[in-house]
A protein has these predicted regions:
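Cytosolic juxtamembrane amphipathic/interface segments immediately preceding
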Residues: 2-7, 173, 270-276
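Membrane-water interface segments at the C-terminal ends of transmembrane alpha-helices
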Residues: 4-36, 48-159, 187-207, 235-254, ...
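Short alpha-helical segment immediately N-terminal to, or the first helix within
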Residues: 43-44, 157-158, 182, 198, ...
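Short helix-to-coil transition segments within interhelical loops
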Residues: 46, 82, 158-188, 215, ...
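Glycine-rich helix-loop "coupling/hinge" segments at transmembrane-helix boundaries
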Residues: 111, 204-230, 463-491, 524
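Membrane-interfacial helical/loop segments at transmembrane boundaries in membrane proteins
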Residues: 118-128, 214-216, 313, 473
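Short cytosolic juxtamembrane segments of multi-pass membrane proteins
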Residues: 165, 262-274, 421, 515-524
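Flexible interhelical linker loops that connect adjacent transmembrane helices
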Residues: 256-288
């Protein structure tokens, strides 16, 4: 009983401040939205053409999801299940474009394809027939740079799928296409739905790409409105609408997954035999190389080229140095706070009967950045004016947005350790914290590092919430990129800062991928 009480006290101590910062912003938005009179809201909704905007965002999210799946799923199958040349290197390179935020991808393709861009100038024309600005261009960019999410989830599912099931199907006389359609794809359905949901919701709530490519969405309306007026009732009501639609999509996914079972009753899973591509081996490699070029090599090359056109680059970087330090300070602090809370939550929930705080943490992760930024700014202004308009507000915002991935990483690491390891240490006279420090912590360090890196990367690249919550004069690198790109266009200053941000994010992200890539054997 004392042990149970100890876990309950710990989890309650984590639950109360977490609930304060997670539910407080939502409560503020609900309260402000309730002050918006119904008739007035309907009139403003007509002025804003709200039904058309919602339909446009739904189209954007659908096109983005389909495009990302068309790119990421074949890439995962080729890398994991075929004798593709260099598959181990590709397995490491394919997720690396996640270090490039989609809004930087939009900047890259503006530099490359927009009127007056690199390609039109090279061809000697004013503009290209294709139009980068609009729903089509935004879907192209978002799908391209979100496809690694599909790749990660589907490749992981392919690695875990028992190949014996496919062997039985082949033994029953089914051809390769029939096995893929009737066995492999149904087993991949949870991963496909999960990845598709991530892409759909990201596109639905995106701000950076759609603002740069001039697509009118709920997020751009919310941001533009709060910049031009002190009345937050309408943007709060729109934020509630955006969040409600997000929750409906999440519930729909749970309903779809809940209707079917996905249990594989197997023992140890042996590696699947590689499918021989035969004459298609090198064409498949060319396809994969094209993917890596479009999502990684070309963006880096374009940013490097545009940055090289900057006069006095050293002086410019020196001037921008404070913004880099702002980004680093808030991202490191936000990641450290998130990991600390995640460790306490995962440990208390995994080692005793405790309050289930992790479910509360997921609320913040499901809220779009624009919505949380608006709610957090208003909530802190009303409840904690000492934190409002300081860098601490950004740190708390990053914690609420991204503590869930950290918690999942720590939980996964703890799940691999049996509680008897700590119990053995305690039987030798060590207390709970001493046993954790001496036994558990050294064994879960990789999981802790992975969770910290993930939150750091996400915080370092966050744009929408940062724009709204940041104190006056406290800009970060993403904010400066956006300001330069919106005010002047895809010019060298924006490209230089974008290159700095990508390289800063890529280093820790590559460390994670290096550990992960060891699970893929080289092609034979």
């Amino acid at each position: 009983m004392p042990g149970i009480r100890r876990w309950s006290v710990l989890s309650l101590g984590l639950a109360l401040p977490t609930a304060f910062f997670v539910l407080g912003p939502l409560g503020f938005l609900l309260w402000m939205g309730a002050t918006q009179e119904g008739a007035d809201f309907l009139e403003r909704a007509r002025d804003l053409e709200l039904p058309r905007v919602v339909g446009q965002v739904a189209l954007l999210a659908t096109l983005t999801t389909a495009w990302a799946a068309a790119l990421g799923v074949p890439l995962a199958w080729l890398t994991v299940r075929t004798d593709l040349p260099g598959r181990r290197l590709i397995h490491w390179l394919a997720p690396l474009p996640l270090a490039i935020p989609p809004y930087i991808g939009a900047l890259v393709y503006q530099i490359l394809l927009a009127p007056g861009g690199v390609l039109p100038n090279f061809l000697g024309v004013t503009s290209l027939p294709l139009n980068l600005y609009g729903v089509g261009g935004a879907a192209w960019v978002l799908g391209l740079f979100m496809s690694p999410y599909l790749y990660l989830l589907v490749s992981g599912a392919l690695e875990r799928t028992n190949p014996a099931l496919e062997e039985v199907a082949r033994g029953a006389g089914l051809g390769p296409r029939q096995v893929l359609r009737r066995v492999t794809l149904p087993l991949l359905r949870p991963a496909l739905l999960a990845g598709g949901l991530v892409v759909f919701l990201y596109s639905w709530a995106d701000f950076g790409v759609v603002s740069l490519l001039r697509v009118r969405t709920l997020t751009t309306i919310i941001y533009d409105y709060i910049q031009g007026t002190a009345d937050w009732a309408l943007p709060s009501a729109l934020s509630i609408l955006l969040t409600a639609i997000t929750i409906l999509v999440l519930l729909l996914q749970l309903r779809v997954l809940g209707r079917a079972g996905y249990t594989q009753i197997v023992g140890a899973v042996k590696p699947a035999p590689l499918v021989s591509l035969g004459a298609w081996r090198w064409p498949a490699f060319a396809y994969v190389g094209g993917m890596v070029t479009l999502t990684l090599l070309l963006p880096l090359g374009v940013l490097g080229y545009q940055a090289s056109r900057l006069p006095a680059p050293a002086a410019f970087v020196l001037i921008q140095w404070p913004y880099f330090l702002n980004s680093l300070w808030t991202a490191v602090s936000g990641a450290s706070l998130a990991l600390l809370i995640a460790l306490g939550v995962a440990w208390s929930e995994g080692r005793g009967r405790a309050w289930r705080v992790s479910g509360l943490l997921q609320v913040g992760y499901a809220i779009p950045g624009t919505v949380l930024g608006l709610g957090m700014a208003g909530f802190l202004h009303a409840a904690l004016p000492g934190i409002y308009a300081t860098s601490l507000a950004l740190i708390v915002t990053y914690f609420v947005l991204y503590v869930t991935p950290a918690c999942q990483s720590v939980k996964a690491a703890l799940a691999q350790l049996h509680p008897s390891l700590e119990e053995a240490a305690r039987s030798l006279g060590r207390g709970p914290l001493a046993a954790f420090w001496a036994v558990t912590l050294p064994l879960i360090k990789p999981g802790l590092l992975g969770g910290w890196i993930l939150v750091f990367v996400l915080s370092m690249r966050e744009l929408a919430a940062t724009l709204i919550v940041r104190p006056p004069g406290f800009d970060t690198i993403p904010v400066r990129i956006w300001i330069y790109a919106m005010d002047v266009g895809p010019e060298p200053r924006a490209a230089t800062l974008a290159l700095i941000l990508v390289l800063t994010i890529a280093l820790p992200w590559a460390m994670m991928l290096s550990l992960r890539s060891r699970g893929i054997p080289p092609s034979g």
